[in-house]
Amino acid sequence: MEVLKVSTKSNPNSVAGGLAAIIKEKNIVEIQAVGAGAINQAVKAIAIARGFVAPSGRDIVCVPAFTDIEIDGEERTAIKLIVQPR
């Protein structure tokens, strides 16, 4: 499964484009985000990507979960958003 890492500084339109391309190619993608700002950007990107794939008759859903990741040698809890067609 392809993993996209989103930060507070990520451009939602850019993330949405990548997300839509991966959904079309592989049918599933995982987005990882740490912190409220990053999660906000990720959710905006999912909403934008839904608009990108809708004209082709597809709809996407998002399943949230927690995951532990390592950043600079430190364990952090992240939100992972599994995005896939409905």
Ranges and model annotations:
Residues E2-I28, A42, I46, R50, ...:
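Conserved mixed alpha/beta catalytic, RNA-binding, or beta-rich assembly cores of soluble enzyme
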Residues S10, V34-G37:
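Short beta->alpha linker loops
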Residues A36-I60:
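Short, hydrophobic/π-rich interface segment
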Residues A54-R86:
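C-terminal edge-of-domain segments
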Residues M1-E2, R86:
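Low-complexity, interaction-prone regions
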